[in-house]
């Protein structure tokens, strides 16, 4: 499972002026942010209850669109992980620190797909900062 924000504005990344280097998000000068990454999850019979057999690669962090920004698209992707697949050590170290939000920015679902295959299911929701000032 991965949960990814597809609308992260460029100003959320420190010192970013090279927009061509960003993983494309939805809209100009937008990128992505990883909010959750679980792997080694299996459906356990008889009721196919999901059970995780490892710690999350990136612990869950809830949606947090910046105040004053448009609604953000959050997508939950489900991948069928290949037998014996484990994340790269560098990724494990990079995402392990839940308080380091910059390490989770510019996340590439496409790069993950090259390792484990295309998503087999997905769902999404929209949310925005409830403190936004509405106009018109």
Which residues does each predicted region cover?
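N-terminus-centered regions that define maturation/targeting leaders and the start
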Residues: 2-136
């Amino acid at each position: 499972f991965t949960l990814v924000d597809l609308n992260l504005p460029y100003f959320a990344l420190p010192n970013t002026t090279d927009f061509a280097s960003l993983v494309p998000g939805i809209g100009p000068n937008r990128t992505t942010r990883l909010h959750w990454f679980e792997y080694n999850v299996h459906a356990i019979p008889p009721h196919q209850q999901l059970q995780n057999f490892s710690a999350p690669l990136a612990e869950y962090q809830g949606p947090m669109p910046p105040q004053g920004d448009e609604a953000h698209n959050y997508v939950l992707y489900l991948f069928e992980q290949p037998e014996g697949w484990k994340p790269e050590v560098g990724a494990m170290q990079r995402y392990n620190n839940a308080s380091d939000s910059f390490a989770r920015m510019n996340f590439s679902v496409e790069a993950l797909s090259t390792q484990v295959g295309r998503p087999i299911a997905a769902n999404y929701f929209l949310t925005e900062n409830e403190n936004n000032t509405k106009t018109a």
